[in-house]
Amino acid sequence: MSHNTFGHLFRVTTWGESHGAALGCVIDGCPPGIAFTLTEIQAYLNKRRPGHSEYTTQRRELDQVEILSGVVSQNDGKALVTTGTPISMFIRNVDHHSEDYNAIMHKYRPGHADYTYDVKYGIRDHRGGGRASARETVVRVAAGALARKIVPGLIVRGAVTAIGPHNIDRDRWDWSEVDKNPFFSPDAQAACVFANYISQLCKTGSSVGAIVEIVAENVPAGLGAPVYAKLDQDIASFLMSINAVKGIEIGDGFAAAHLTGEENADEMRMGSDGKPVFLSNHAGGILGGISNGQPIVARFAVKPTSSILTPSRSIDIEGNDVNVMTKGRHDPCVGIRAVPVGEAMVACAIADHYLRHRGQVGCI
């Protein structure tokens, strides 16, 4: 299986399976001299970590990152500094129940990659989905923590804006609320609605989808290039690679199709500091594939978790009609824990383009 690497200059290769001994990544192209601590990386991993909320999977993983190469310790014994050589990180799996999947070893679970992996490779890891599991994204979050350090002042934040039929009220958007509830909701009232909805859903053994919004601030203007190296092109590609993601939009996205040219135009004026000021941000911070200095806004839709307790019709590897009921521990809404993953992928895309721009044009 190839295609386990993303990025051009800031290149991340991930490895490992859901029920293997560990998952890891190798980061190649990270500049030397980037200082960080394991505590900083762990903070992002903890946002994604399973088993600490009744609204996510009860698989309990510590998700403690270990670094094997590419850094040296500072005198304080806590801070690490990148050396410019490949950085290898891994996270051990400690709580997988592979026996839960014995009953579906020879059956294809609807909505999963079981059938397509089998068709392509002639073999698949039935234990938790193997490489197709969302468990793979844990090391992307670790890589994203480093990516944030590359672009000076970069802030990347994410939030859940909808779960199933329930949406947040954007007039109540408050970033300070995101870390106060298990749904990463910027709307405290919506978080209560999400809680009641997911609680009822869990009783039926079903699942539901979600919409996640990522906002990147302090992105310098000029990142990205026409025509086949657009910044929004890579952001969309990186986000689309996340498990269960089925749709992407940048800025107003599909809503822009319902606007007039006058409504959609991000008009400009010269600010008092001599720099241009945009009067709106329908484009989501990117024009012609190049960042314009405004916040970059991206949204992605996450489908309902395919593993549910409701029996589903399918076939087995011999072509027989069967019914499938997936046991194991699964997220009723996998979109919730996709928030830190989306943040990481956007951070990696921006860091990659920052280095590419610096290499082509010089200092930013």
From Swiss-Prot:
Pfam families, A to Z: Chorismate_synt (PF01264)
SUPFAM superfamilies reported for this sequence: Chorismate synthase, AroC
Keywords: Amino-acid biosynthesis, Aromatic amino acid biosynthesis, FAD, Flavoprotein, FMN, Lyase, NADP
Database matches in PROSITE patterns: CHORISMATE_SYNTHASE_1, CHORISMATE_SYNTHASE_2, CHORISMATE_SYNTHASE_3
Any one GO molecular-function label of the UniProt entry: FMN binding
Cofactor annotation comment: Reduced FMN (FMNH(2)).
Pathway(s) this gene product operates in, as recorded in its UniProt entry: Metabolic intermediate biosynthesis; chorismate biosynthesis; chorismate from D-erythrose 4-phosphate and phosphoenolpyruvate: step 7/7
Gene3D superfamilies, per database record: Chorismate synthase AroC
Catalytic activity line of the entry: 5-O-(1-carboxyvinyl)-3-phosphoshikimate = chorismate + phosphate
The protein's name in its UniProt record: Chorismate synthase
